[in-house]
């Protein structure tokens, strides 16, 4: 036992009377369980650090920012000042929420505003080749969500879905948010070209079959960040068929947004700490 306390792993002789053998087995089993627990904690910590770094890097995509500024420059040169002002305003909203004072947990209303601004900018880039509709129940706005989980799904809807469709094809992306019992579901659905069964089966894994271009890695990151914050019963669900479109569902617990809940969640104490129903 003293060797265990010192961090060593001595061989245990299990022999003698039945009581001694039982004690030996118990000590050995306890140590094995502690080792497994420590390995799991280390794995989760490494995964959390990786997910947080990936999220930080995706907050302001240099290519997206460059393309947006190029579009604004073109508008100014073409004397489309009203359009340029609109784009600058949307970009400012997007950057404000992306940074959000370094917070990881934000209101769903802010996440949806970020998504609206992102899509308004992308629609200009894609020359209005698709439409976007947001159907968000008002009663979900003041609940907690992990920051920047909708944008990568919208990117996926453009890349795999409507981005390559002509304007006459009627491309559309719909974002729907609703609360059911103690859970919240945010669904992003498009009527684009869809994904193969192989891609769907692997897109939320680290499998090498996941495409490394587009937002395949982004979806894995979103799924991992949600599960690390709220638990393995939450995350993303992906449904898609070639030429039929794609539907991706974000599933999170319904936790009212207030300062106490935000702080507790960001400390990774959900499930142990007390979250409140009070709004601030």
Model regions and ranges:
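Two-component histidine phosphotransfer core
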Residues: 1-239, 245-251
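C-terminal end segment of the histidine kinase catalytic
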Residues: 236-280
């Amino acid at each position: 036992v003293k060797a265990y306390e010192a961090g060593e792993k001595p061989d245990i002789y299990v022999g003698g009377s039945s009581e001694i053998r039982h004690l030996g087995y118990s000590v050995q089993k306890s140590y094995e369980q502690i080792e497994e627990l420590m390995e799991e904690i280390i794995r989760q910590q490494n995964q959390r650090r990786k997910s947080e770094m990936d999220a930080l890097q995706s907050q302001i995509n240099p290519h997206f920012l460059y393309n947006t500024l190029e579009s604004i420059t073109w508008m100014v040169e073409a004397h489309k000042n009203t359009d340029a002002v609109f784009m600058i305003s949307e970009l400012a909203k997007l950057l404000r929420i992306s940074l959000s004072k370094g917070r990881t947990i934000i209101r769903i209303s802010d996440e949806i505003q970020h998504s609206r601004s992102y899509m308004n900018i992308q629609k200009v880039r894609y020359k209005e080749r698709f439409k976007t509709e947001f159907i968000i129940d008002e009663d979900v706005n003041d609940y907690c969500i992990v920051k920047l989980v909708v944008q990568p799904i919208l990117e996926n809807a453009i890349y795999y879905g409507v981005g390559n469709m002509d304007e006459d094809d009627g491309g559309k992306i719909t974002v729907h948010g609703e609360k059911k019992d103690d859970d919240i579901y945010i669904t992003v659905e498009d009527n684009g070209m869809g994904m193969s069964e192989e891609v769907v089966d692997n897109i939320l894994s680290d499998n090498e079959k996941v495409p490394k271009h587009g937002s395949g890695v982004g979806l894995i990151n979103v799924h991992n960040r949600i599960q690390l914050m709220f638990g393995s019963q939450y995350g993303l669900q992906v449904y898609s068929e070639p030429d039929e479109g794609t539907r991706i569902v974000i599933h999170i617990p319904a936790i009212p947004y207030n300062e106490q809940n935000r702080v507790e969640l960001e400390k990774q104490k959900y499930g142990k700490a007390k979250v409140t129903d009070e709004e601030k």
